[in-house]
């Protein structure tokens, strides 16, 4: 485990301990630190990174401010967005980082950023981090078509934990995701580093599906703990 992975794990474990102080929906990334590690090894500051509701590891991988992230989750004015965004919607323009609570909500925005970079002299690319459930949104497939049609420097990183909340992927989808993506003409990879390098070097879209195992609850927040404590008796 590298220093970055250790930092991320320590941050998330600390949040678990202080979860009774958190009053915004919070999705921890315990078990997915290696994804951030691989991303950090290839990203440059100029890259645009679009994340999900489970974004802490992505943000720290991009070089984000750990203390400001903590303050934001705690709802403090000193947070990244003044305490108004909470965990799910953090934005840090200084490092081109954006997150959204909506499943698949930023894939189209990531494609737009890639479109703006298409004819740029910059070496930057657009990176969209998503979960497997995002592939159940129509915009995901529309973006694949658009990215191939216009040769967009867009790298899509899918963290597939096999679940949408508690519904297993076998209950929601038929077949594997990567072959469907490849059918659009998108170059698919098994390594995050290879996918990012391909998009950067060739200015073309890429896709990588990383199988991960989330080692914590889907959602953590103080109000859920309170609900458990105040649950009505069953009889």
Each model region followed by its residue ranges:
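Conserved thiamine diphosphate
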Residues: 120-122, 171-199, 228-235
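Cofactor-binding active-site loop characterized by glycine-rich and histidine/acidic residues
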Residues: 16, 21-150, 168-183
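Cofactor-/ligand-binding subdomain signature composed of acidic, glycine-rich
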Residues: 1-25, 45, 225, 232-233
């Amino acid at each position: 485990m590298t220093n970055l992975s250790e930092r991320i794990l320590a941050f998330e474990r600390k949040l678990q301990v202080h979860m009774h102080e958190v009053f915004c929906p919070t999705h921890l990334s315990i078990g997915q630190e290696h994804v951030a590690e691989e991303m950090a090894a290839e990203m440059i500051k100029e890259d645009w990174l679009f994340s999900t509701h489970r974004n802490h590891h992505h943000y720290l991988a991009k070089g984000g401010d750990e203390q400001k992230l903590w303050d934001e989750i705690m709802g403090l004015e000193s947070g990244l967005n003044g305490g108004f965004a909470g965990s799910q919607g953090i934005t840090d323009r200084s490092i081109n980082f954006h997150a959204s609570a909506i499943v698949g909500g930023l894939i189209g925005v990531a494609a737009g950023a890639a479109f703006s970079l298409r004819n740029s002299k910059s070496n930057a690319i657009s990176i969209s981090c998503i979960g497997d459930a995002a592939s159940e949104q129509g915009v995901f497939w529309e973006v694949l078509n658009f990215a191939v049609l216009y040769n967009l420097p867009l790298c899509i990183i899918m963290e597939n934990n096999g679940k949408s909340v508690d519904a297993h992927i076998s209950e929601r989808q038929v077949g594997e995701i990567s072959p469907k993506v490849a059918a659009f003409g998108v170059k698919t990879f098994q390594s995050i580093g290879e996918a990012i390098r391909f998009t950067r070097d060739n200015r073309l879209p890429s896709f990588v599906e990383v199988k991960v195992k989330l080692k914590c609850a889907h959602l953590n927040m103080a109000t859920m703990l309170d609900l458990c404590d105040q649950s009505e008796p069953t009889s």
